[in-house]
Amino acid sequence: MELDFGHFDERDKASRNMRGSRMNGLPSPTHSAHCSFYRTRTLQALSNEKKAKKVRFYRNGDRYFKGIVYAVSSDRFRSFDALLADLTRSLSDNINLPQGVRYIYTIDGSRKIGSMDELEEGESYVCSSDNFFKKVEYTKNVNPNWSVNVKTSANMKAPQSLASSNSAQARENKDFVRPKLVTIIRSGVKPRKAVRVLLNKKTAHSFEQVLTDITEAIKLETGVVKKLYTLDGKQVTCLHDFFGDDDVFIACGPEKFRYAQDDFSLDENECRVMKGNPSAAAGPKASPTPQKTSAKSPGPMRRSKSPADSGNDQDANGTSSSQLSTPKSKQSPISTPTSPGSLRKHKVDLYLPLSLDDSDSLGDSM
């Protein structure tokens, strides 16, 4: 006699399934709400990682560059070096980035960026070739509406008021600015390097900007030019001090400057042409000037024809010999202090001590 126990197997299978669900306390992992939440969180993190960050990059020390906007993502740049290489192709020039982009700083220079994860959405950064940040108002030439997080209504009013205040301040402060050539001498052991900087309304916008230009020109071993002194030992504190009576300034870096009288005195190498220097008084360019004046002015010609000399000149070669002998015999009235030649030499003597690098070329041109 055979009995059918199939219904007992189905009942045991159902009880085993119920027992397993009670032991876990959760339904099957494939159908649980926890698993769906985990999958959503993973996809969200993955999308955030691949989402591009919109940032702006500037050139170090370039106050006229409006910046370039980059969409930085891990898909576009596999590494931080790849980002630096791409920025080099986009921003490199011979003036501000001569060696390409090697460093990235925050907009205030307080921190150096070392990876793409440190870049933040909507922020601005400065690219540099060397490990030296130049403080410049990079964002003043940029329209702030490029960021999606900034309201447009407030930004449309702010630039107008800022532009009007800047223009009024510029008109008020630029009255004393005039074209002037100043000499900057690097502090340190003599002989010292000196450069000449032209200041006018296009180059002298502010005191900080002039210090930046002097830093680029003088190239101190200690870095940035922090202080400037006149030859009298007075510190230059504002833009107006450049347009006073002083034309020569001593540039000092971050190091502590020790006042010494020898630091404010120019040696023989730094002042090659002085008032009592005979090489400046009788240069090779002094002879053409008397010839031109003697040929055009009839006064010296009449004085040279004395009765004794005129007879000798007529016996030898006639009138032409007296004309040729006139420049040699009449150099004394031409070198008088009131003549144009002496005034021209006097200006060179006063001006050339300020030029240390190209005094010879200026003497020839003048």
From Swiss-Prot:
Primary location recorded for the protein, binned into one broad class: cytoplasm
Signal peptide per UniProt: none
Skewed-composition ranges (Acidic residues): 357-366
GO biological process: axon extension; axoneme assembly; brain development; central nervous system projection neuron axonogenesis; dendrite morphogenesis; hippocampus development; intracellular signal transduction; layer formation in cerebral cortex
General function of this protein: Microtubule-associated protein required for initial steps of neuronal dispersion and cortex lamination during cerebral cortex development. May act by competing with the putative neuronal protein kinase DCLK1 in binding to a target protein. May in that way participate in a signaling pathway that is crucial for neuronal interaction before and during migration, possibly as part of a calcium ion-dependent signal transduction pathway. May participate along with PAFAH1B1/LIS-1 in a distinct overlapping signaling pathway that promotes neuronal migration.
Subunit note: Interacts with tubulin. Interacts with USP9X.
Protein name (record): Neuronal migration protein doublecortin
Source organism per UniProt: Mus musculus (Mouse)
Lineage: Eukaryota, Metazoa, Chordata, Craniata, Vertebrata
